[in-house]
Regions:
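Residues in the short beta-alpha loop(s) of Rossmann-like NAD(P)-binding domains
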Residues: 3, 71, 96
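Adenosine-nucleotide cofactor-binding segment
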Residues: 1-54
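Glycine-centered, small-residue-biased loops immediately flanking beta-strands
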Residues: 63-64, 88
Length: 147
């Protein structure tokens, strides 16, 4: 990702390594800490054309790339030759599809969503909620609108 708060939160939630793609050369970082082997599971969450295009070079042979981030321009350069040579798999996630029931169950069972639901807004302030989510991506992970 490119938002440091999100990366910090990922570490608190159990990630073993994260890389801020705005600050570091992701390819060099991954090569160094995997001794050139690559990553078993690559999750691209930023939705940046640059970070999406890097994923074939990050995944290890037989690994999996999961594309979560949505690029503003749907046309992104992607090296399928690298994917084929590594026999890697590509998965995509359309954000929240089929997750509502699981999310409701998790919250009902006591999971703490405080790190994810970082901001709450009353319905009357819906415009403010959208503006915060769009303009303050560094701090707003998810904005909750109370009905």
């Amino acid at each position: 990702d490119m938002a440091q708060k999100r990366l910090d939160d990922a570490m608190k939630l159990g990630a073993t390594r994260v890389i801020n793609a705005k600050e570091k050369d992701v390819l060099k970082e991954v090569e160094a800490f995997t001794n050139g082997v690559g990553i078993e599971k690559v999750f691209e969450t930023a939705g940046s054309p640059v970070t999406i295009a890097q994923t074939p070079y990050l995944v290890k042979k037989g690994g999996t790339i999961t594309l979560v981030g949505m690029a503003a321009d749907p046309k992104v350069k992607f090296n399928f030759g690298q994917i084929m040579a590594k026999e890697a798999r590509i998965e995509s996630v359309f954000r929240y599809r089929n997750l509502y029931a699981k999310a409701i169950s998790a919250v009902a069972n006591g999971i703490d969503i405080g790190m994810v639901a970082t901001h709450e807004f009353d319905f009357e302030h819906i415009q403010e909620a959208y503006e915060a989510a769009i303009n303050d991506k560094e701090n707003v992970v998810k904005a909750v609108i109370k009905l």
